Amino acid sequence: SFVDISKMKPLKIVVNAGNGCANICFENLKKYLPFHFTEQYMKPNATFPHGVPNPMLEECRRPLINQVLLDGADMGVAWDGDFDRCFFIDHKGNFVEGYYMVALLSRYFLNRYKGETIIHDPRVYWCVQKVCKELGGISVESKGGHAFMKETMRKVGGIYGAENSAHHFFRDFSYCDSGMIPWLIVAQIISETNESLYELVSDLEKEFPCSGEINLPASHVDRVMQAVEKEYAKDAKEIQHIDGLGMDFGEWRFNLRASNTEPLIRFNMETRGDKLLLEEKKKAIMEFIKNQN
């Protein structure tokens, strides 16, 4: 079992399915749970009257954030249309980047299962690697995408793997991803620690500030990425091509990946505790890519 319901407190949780499919599973779960729910857009509706069910988009999160603040809820949870991903709002109305949720869940598993292996994607990962090192776990990098993540998890026997896009994979769930297991684990962590979600991730956010995923238009994606690598290679301590282009400069690093469906470059960046450096380098790289177009 991933959680112990007997240890859970009667948290106030706002849930939003975006009129997707999550309610089918949620209805079967909630009768066993001690939480007080406020429900938004839970009825499946293929016309999506409240907009596309994509909580990665800021405008899709606004109703959930407003309700969390109105209710004084402990957290908000939103699912995408097929509910294989879930997204979190803390009690202050802040969206919690998937990166920090991966680190939080990694900490949960490593506290319970010593020496286990955690799989992460190449976008941003310093935070996850630190958690693994502190708790005696092993971190393994995998190319993003469910097929690659599952293959890597099976190969190394990873107990948990995740992409920063909010796909969470579990060995004891047949190595599949789930949008229901993560929020139940987070609810248990809050219940056990008496810490808010905000408190649980604030140290991670400060130590490893990240850009979040930024989509940048690029008419010739491969050419642009080659130009970026050439421009920054002389200062890089490490260059990776596990999934797109990853460049590490010691105190900051970034990853560029080509979209599979659109003429876009997906840009992620992180630093070691330096928000000013994050903004400076982010702006410079985005401007460089813009000029290549």
Q: Would you name each region that the model predicts?
A:
Residues 1-194, 206:
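Phosphate-binding chemistry for phosphorylated carbohydrates and sugar-nucleotides
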Residues 113-293:
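Phosphate-binding and adjacent anionic-ligand microenvironments
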